[in-house]
A protein has these predicted regions:
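Switch/communication elements of ASCE P-loop NTPase nucleotide-binding domains
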Residues: 1-94, 111-112
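Acidic, divalent-metal-binding catalytic cores of TOPRIM
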Residues: 60-250
Length: 250
């Protein structure tokens, strides 16, 4: 007879989203996380909603019969990343856990533009299992580090980070910010957050430094050589395609 103290008790729950609606799912997860801290509960799901409310430290990503823990020490996420993601990783963004490929973008423009362009190229992203995650100008590298491992056992999900170079053409300040900036001597010398081309002395180094902030393992950063993705495309002969895409979005 085994001592009762040596026995382990597990609760196994398979895909609760198949049986209860969204509000009940949230209530179930909250109850388990609050009352089941001293119990072993294993829950399987294909629901981004559930994945978004479970503490990141408690998530396991299953791929090709391997389990990849998201807990601290297993990923390249640091303590501040976990706090940030617990707050901002919502049900829409949590779709990244179920994708075959992920594209992380920094705004609604790219989030709308890329799927439309893919369709025009007959490469529907949904058909390929690719999810686009819009991080709203902040946190791109935090989301990328979800897929980067400390132990070197890589998750086989390609992740592309699309970020702007954010360096304007010299003519842009007068057009986009203030018409009084028509000459360089009129540009504010302090507290301005924007840069222009003439201020970047080593373009390759500037781009490389941005890339290295997120690159690694299965994560690769893509940066336009010019101002933004949209500006780059228009400047390289894709102006008509851009207009067609914008018209399609409308």
């Amino acid at each position: 007879n085994q001592d009762d103290n040596e026995l382990s008790t597990f609760m196994l729950i398979e895909e609760p989203e198949a049986h209860i609606h969204a509000q009940r799912q949230l209530k179930l997860i909250q109850s388990m996380q609050n009352k089941g801290k001293n119990q072993q509960i294993i829950l399987t799901t294909h629901s981004p909603l559930l994945a978004s409310v479970v503490e990141l430290n408690n998530l396991l990503l299953i791929q090709n019969r391997k389990a990849f823990s998201m807990r601290a020490g297993e990923t390249l996420l640091d303590a501040s990343d976990y706090k940030y993601l617990e707050r901002y990783l919502d049900a829409t963004k949590a779709n990244l856990f179920f994708a075959r490929g992920v594209i992380i973008v920094e705004g609604p423009g790219e989030a709308l533009l890329l799927p439309t362009l893919a369709n025009l190229l007959h490469r529907n992203l949904t058909d390929y299992g690719v999810s686009i995650v819009d991080v709203k100008s902040t946190g791109l590298r935090r989301y990328a580090r979800i897929f980067q491992r400390k132990n070197g056992d890589e998750i086989n999900i390609p992740v592309s980070c699309i970020t702007d170079r954010d360096v304007m053409p010299d003519c842009a300040p007068a057009i986009c910010i203030d018409e009084t900036y028509d000459k360089e001597e009129n540009w504010p010398k302090k507290n301005r957050k924007w840069k222009v081309e003439s201020e970047i002395t080593d373009k390759e180094k500037y781009i490389h430094e941005i890339e290295e902030k997120a690159n690694g393992q299965n994560v690769k950063t893509f940066i336009p050589e010019q101002w933004t993705l949209e500006y780059e495309m228009a400047a390289n002969g894709l102006g008509e395609e851009m207009l067609e895409t914008i018209a399609t979005l409308r």
